[in-house]
């Protein structure tokens, strides 16, 4: 993806994601204009410049599909993949995925992804390409009242905003739990140059890092 294609890729993300949700009896996930999805291009290019593949129609020149990927020390992470509904069934997603697998193989790294079990089309694609599920996560939806939550925090923990000095311990904790390292991601969230991230850490009374949580407000 080059800079001139970012807006078109954002429109593709917006259109194809909403199309899938609507086709499966759900509400559109993006409620605003296509420009909302430009955040994906901005953030992913901040983190990994030049790591987005696009498939373009040779006849019309339209962007038919896109996929971001994120090379890390321990793995290559597969980012958001989208194919225009106008180009479904033409093997575009498979071609993009095959290319990224080759990029990872060239670096002798495994490919890691987090995929919704609700999307059987993508689950089938990944399975055919050799992926195997190793861990399940549960989506959680919380309705936050206008006045917010006012839960008391146990005095047995210290919860505060993350600092760059926390990154080393965050990396160690995640590697122990998941076997991966993402130091540059944690630094990016904490530095928060776009002003949209909030990263918290939780420490025990002895100072041990017990957990951390990142969120985005956009």
Regions from the PLM with identified roles:
Residues 10-59, 63, 176-199, 204:
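Active-site rim helix/loop that mediates acceptor-substrate recognition in acyltransferases
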Residues 4, 8, 73, 120-121, ...:
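Short alpha-helical
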Residues 80-83, 89-104, 123-128:
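Conserved acetyl-CoA-binding loop-helix of GNAT-fold acetyltransferases
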Residues 76-79, 104-118:
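Conserved GNAT acetyl-CoA-binding A-motif
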Residues 71, 84-86, 90, 118:
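Active-site acidic-Proline motif in GNAT/NAT acetyltransferases
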